[in-house]
């Protein structure tokens, strides 16, 4: 099994993640010696359609410490860099403790948790059909 990459978002501009949680997660990542990538703000990167999002989305399995899984999914999709649903686990620094997040980040187990549905090339939301052999409706 491939070791998941770790991505840490500092949520610098939105300032919606508790500072104590961000600081504790970052400190534990730095102290661990585990390789990780840190970005200032995924929201800002998405708004600029930063090419780094493509590299991050296409690099294999990834665990992301940021905010809500649905928000992270759509930030990447808005930049035309969709995350692989089966290879992405998002840890929510808005609702989870630093201990919960770092335990999950350091665990070799992947728990993919992106919500169902995907973005189409024209920006429409596509709902994945739960009925086999049935087309998915577009919104």
Regions found by a protein language model. Give the residues of each.
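Iron-sulfur-associated redox domains of electron-transfer enzymes in respiratory
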Residues: 1-139
């Amino acid at each position: 099994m491939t070791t998941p990459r770790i991505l840490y978002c500092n949520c610098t501009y939105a300032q919606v993640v508790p500072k104590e949680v961000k600081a504790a997660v970052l400190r534990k990542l730095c102290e661990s010696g585990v390789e990780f990538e840190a970005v200032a703000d995924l929201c800002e990167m998405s708004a600029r359609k930063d090419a780094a999002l493509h590299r991050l989305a296409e690099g294999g399995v990834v665990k992301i410490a940021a905010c809500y899984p649905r928000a992270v999914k759509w930030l990447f999709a808005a930049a035309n860099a969709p995350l692989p649903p089966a290879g992405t686990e998002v840890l929510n620094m808005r609702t989870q403790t630093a201990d919960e997040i770092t335990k999950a980040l350091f665990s070799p187990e992947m728990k993919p948790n992106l919500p169902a549905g995907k973005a189409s090339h024209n920006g429409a939301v596509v709902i994945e059909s739960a009925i086999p052999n049935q087309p998915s409706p577009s919104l």
